[in-house]
Swiss-Prot record:
Belongs to the gastrin/cholecystokinin family. The modification Sulfotyrosine is found at residues 97, 113. Residues 1-20 form the signal peptide. GO terms for cellular component: axon; extracellular space. It comes from the Eukaryota. This is Cholecystokinin. It is found in: Secreted. Residues 21-44 are annotated as: Disordered. One of its GO terms (biological process) is eating behavior. The keyword Signal applies. It comes from Bos taurus (Bovine). Binds to CCK-A receptors in the pancreas and CCK-B receptors in the brain. The keyword Secreted applies.
Length: 115
């Protein structure tokens, strides 16, 4: 059923795209009529398309996302950097805790740290 819905959606998009394209005229009446038709087209080409603006914004957004994804730390070094960025008054320095408490271990309130 999912495949059928996707197929219908694809066909609808293709049909809408085909209907949106201008139809070429089979019998031109003369060079004057052809020039009259080309003049508005030239004006339309000179006007910036509104559709290009969202595409440009989307492209810029994707470029920033890719740059951030490349700069993002990964692996063990990112865990160490996260540990170093913790507040110095944070009493638990074990990398396994990272702000949460395992019920199998002694709680931070019960244990007095010497540091």
């Amino acid at each position: 059923m999912n495949r059928g819905v996707c197929l219908c959606l694809l066909m609808a998009v293709l049909a809408a795209g085909a209907l949106a394209q201008p139809m070429p005229h089979a019998d031109p009446t003369g060079p004057r009529a052809q020039q009259a038709e080309e003049a508005p087209r030239r004006q339309l080409r000179a006007v910036p398309r509104v559709d290009d603006e969202p595409r440009a914004q989307l492209g810029a957004l994707l470029a920033r996302y890719i740059q951030q994804a490349r700069k993002a730390p990964s692996g063990r070094m990112s865990v160490i950097k996260n540990l170093q960025s913790l507040d110095p008054s944070h009493r638990i320095s074990d990398r396994d805790y990272m702000g949460w408490m395992d019920f199998g271990r002694r709680s931070a309130e019960e244990f007095e740290y010497t540091s």
